A protein has these predicted regions:
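Alpha-helical "hinge/linker" immediately C-terminal to small N-terminal DNA-binding modules
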Residues: 1-20
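Short beta-strand elements of ligand-binding domains
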Residues: 79-84, 106, 131-132
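Central regulatory/effector-binding core of bacterial HTH transcription factors
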Residues: 26-89, 158
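Ligand-binding cleft/hinge of the Venus flytrap
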Residues: 46-52, 120, 138-151
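Secondary-structure junction motif
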Residues: 111-114, 126-148
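Beta-alpha-beta core module
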Residues: 88-95, 99, 163-203
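Flexible hinge/capping segments at coil-to-helix
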Residues: 23, 90-129
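Short hydrophobic/charged patches on amphipathic alpha-helices used for structural packing
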Residues: 69, 73, 93, 117-120, ...
Length: 203
């Protein structure tokens, strides 16, 4: 717990916290995050941080949320960037941003489903692409679906958010993604953003 608070202080109070000590040791900051959060959240913060404090040696361990928590328990990292699991106690959390889980697909996929299965509800006919059961995003969405008595008939599990996005873009099914991350990725390729794509809010 002490190391986590010290790491947060290092980020927030950089000019006061990061100094060479009397033995001139190089300051170190050990971070843990999933590959998705590293790509879509951490990198932009690190770019500015490194520019301000180029003398800090930073290491990043890309792991799942629960593996990141384990590294914190073992004091192998100082700070973890994670999606907060429900009912988790014993850690100090500093909120960074709110995310919205969203189902996304191409307009063509929806049209094809209506042609192929005109009498079936989309929930029963479509293929829904989700992260694996151990993922925090998947667990959160599962809880929301259960609360609304929604049961998906056809689920394709995928290991990474990037693959979910790519599969949705080629019309393989309806992907459950983090909305802002999807829009960032789409925006880099197309200034028109979500043109030709349909969103279904899940949160």
């Amino acid at each position: 717990m002490k190391k986590v608070k010290e790491a947060l202080s290092l980020l927030d109070e950089g000019e006061n916290s990061i100094r060479h000590n009397r033995s001139r040791d190089i300051p170190k900051l050990r971070l843990g995050a999933s590959s998705t959060l590293t790509r879509y959240v951490l990198l932009s913060h690190l770019e500015n941080y490194i520019a301000r404090f180029p003398h800090v040696r930073i290491t990043i361990s890309c792991q799942s949320t629960y593996q990141t928590l384990q590294l914190l328990d073992e004091e192998k990292i100082d700070l973890g960037l994670i999606g907060r699991p429900q009912k988790l106690r014993g850690y100090y959390f500093q909120p960074l941003l709110k995310i919205q889980d969203t189902f996304v697909c191409t307009q063509q996929y929806l049209e094809n489903q209506k042609k192929l299965y005109p009498d079936e509800p989309l929930i029963q006919a479509a293929t829904f692409m989700m992260l694996d059961e151990d993922n925090i995003t998947r667990q959160t969405v599962n809880t929301q679906l259960k609360e609304h008595h929604v049961e998906l008939s056809h689920i394709l599990e995928v290991t990474t958010m990037d693959l979910l996005i790519q599969f949705a873009e080629i019309g393989l099914g309806i992907a459950c993604v983090i909305r802002d991350f999807y829009k960032k990725r789409a925006g880099r390729r197309n200034s028109g953003g979500s043109t030709g794509r349909t969103f279904f809010s899940a949160a």
